[in-house]
Curated annotation (Swiss-Prot):
Function: A cytochrome P450 monooxygenase involved in the metabolism of fatty acids and their oxygenated derivatives (oxylipins). Mechanistically, uses molecular oxygen inserting one oxygen atom into a substrate, and reducing the second into a water molecule, with two electrons provided by NADPH via cytochrome P450 reductase (CPR; NADPH-ferrihemoprotein reductase). Catalyzes predominantly the oxidation of the terminal carbon (omega-oxidation) of saturated and unsaturated fatty acids. May act as a major omega-hydroxylase for dodecanoic (lauric) acid in kidney.
One of the GO biological process terms: omega-hydroxylase P450 pathway
Source species taxonomy: Eukaryota, Metazoa, Chordata, Craniata, Vertebrata
Pathway annotation from the record: Lipid metabolism; fatty acid metabolism
Gene responsible for this protein: Cyp4a12b
Pfam families in UniProt: p450 (PF00067)
Protein name according to UniProt: Cytochrome P450 4A12B
Amino acid sequence: MSASALSSIRFPGSISEYLQVASVLSLLLLLFKTAQLYLHRQWLLSSTQQFPSPPSHWLFGHKILKDQDLQDILTRIKNFPSACPQWLWGSKVRIQVYDPDYMKLILGRSDPKAHGSYRFLAPWIGRGLLLLDGQTWFQHRRMLTPAFHYDILKPYTEIMADSVHVMLDKWEQIVGQDSTLEIFQHITLMTLDTIMKCAFSHEGSVQLDRKYKSYIQAVEDLNNLFFLRVRNIFHQNDIIYRVSSNGCLANSACQLAHDHTDQVIKSRRSQLQDEEELEKLKKKRRLDFLDILLFARMENGKSLSDKDLRAEVDTFMFEGHDTTASGISWIFYALATNPEHQQRCRKEIQSLLGDGASITWNDLDKMPYTTMCIKEALRIYPPVPSVSRELSSPVTFPDGRSLPKGIHVMLSFYGLHHNPTVWPNPEVFDPSRFAPGSSRHSHSFLPFSGGARNCIGKQFAMNELKVAVALTLLRFELLPDPTRVPIPIPRIVLKSKNGIHLHLKKLQ
């Protein structure tokens, strides 16, 4: 082709023309996205019109005060029966549910976890039992259920007691006459110690090894970062989040958590190379949690992939210690602020255990009043404040109101447990609510969720709560610190904004 021919071909004359084209395309894309969001918002408004809510801003939704969510839902319960929409921003809404009939209906269905928020947990805990849905979830649940058979749980009582005694020995050394102790961190180490020994065949004490504090801190950071991300409209995008300061912190915390679980798996695999250890394993009637995973065969005959294995370990490592730490900490606070009930529990335990040098599986069912107090504390302070579902099909509730497929439903256990139409005087600590023979709705008390997707380790957790309460009350009187009243805040588990500080008075 000649030079004259080439010169006759017209190319864009300047960079400004490129910018003009790019600007037009960007504007068209923005208009398309705006229209898309507008239509989605109109669909959401139409879908939730049967459920009144407080006034909301068209763009910012309801004003969410990050650490006042629990107080906010108590206000909603008074003004909006059974359920209420909460707009996170203009094009995202969730229906908060706090009615037992609504709970029963939703928990009896097979709706998946709400993808929008739970997906933010995947980089940390992978797609284990908490995040799985459908047939894969069912296979994993069936595979892991034997790890919580009573034959497995029985010998754990002694292990739990040993871990509690280590914590109490530390408390005796560090508490002074007039000092207070922030108990949550100590209890978290203790519950991690317990789950490591019971479920992961760990030898040694987590509580006496300083290196495990980095894992505890990583879990704390990931809890907070998850909560912050759910409420930040810009951080819904994975690319934006990865380059943000919070995204970098989350990545570092994930790496710390994964290093911990990788070491646990590696250590157990190494132990199982020893023939003597394998022989001991063959003599067991049932395998514990990690050994089930290591020897598991799925329906296709294949063992779990390393990715699936670590996801289940990460999931249960977190759920098996952080939720119970929350439960025990708040139970101790509830007993500290209700000394007459604390003393009655102590007398019951003293008559059963004497000096408390040991506690057995059979003892756990012989402390009825203590169990009533534990349940009442779990009602007021549920370890998991809420769970979410995304409706896979339309639903009609008992009162005739309905929601279409695709709506995000948040089951607020905190709201349910503080609903005055379900629990009269809900803020009053009254263990008699759980007295034998007392009647209540089957779905009015859900500290471990309900339905097919209830907490797989609920019996393990309840046993640990009983052991911790019994042994602690035999050695200490729990007293509140009136200058530092804990402020409950919703994270993945129920935490306190300012810690849980108690006076610990050693009993003679």
